């Protein structure tokens, strides 16, 4: 794609991911720092982290199905339920009856978490996500395989790419592409954690992690940044940069 755009005379220099340096938390939601201490007590690569980002909203029924799917999977889980994920519902109202008491030994529910810290934690074995691009990049950087459940805009395209790259397992919601069902959530988790397909996805994601880090340290991202700086210098001196 980059080469095709350049052939059309478009100046493009891909850089990133850009969240690594000088990252400042921008969310107004209070973060559950205690979740990191909880993760410290879990086995390596055992926890399913489930979060739908800062903007996506889902129905009360789907939150119930998601929660029950996590429960039925028998995996430890960290579930994020934003205050506005389901309108007019508190965390306790948004979850199935007695869910918190039934899962307190192997699950944690938070309103918001420090996602980069969570994804870099050794205990995380998979990330159940809406496939927003920020979450996707953060997961790739940390080598955490994805369970994809896109909701809107570019997220379906993102998941299609991730599945084609063999770094994600989709939650198969059928033609409707919206309604979560607990058995489908459980099936996707089991596929990632216990099947040969899941093993391939985990292995491939670790390869993507290395590619991303090489791009930042000495690869395309670094060379693109250096080229951009050089082009700006040339223009400041009244010279014609390479892309013109």
Predicted feature residues:
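Catalytic core of nucleotide-sugar-dependent glycosyltransferases
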Residues: 1-244
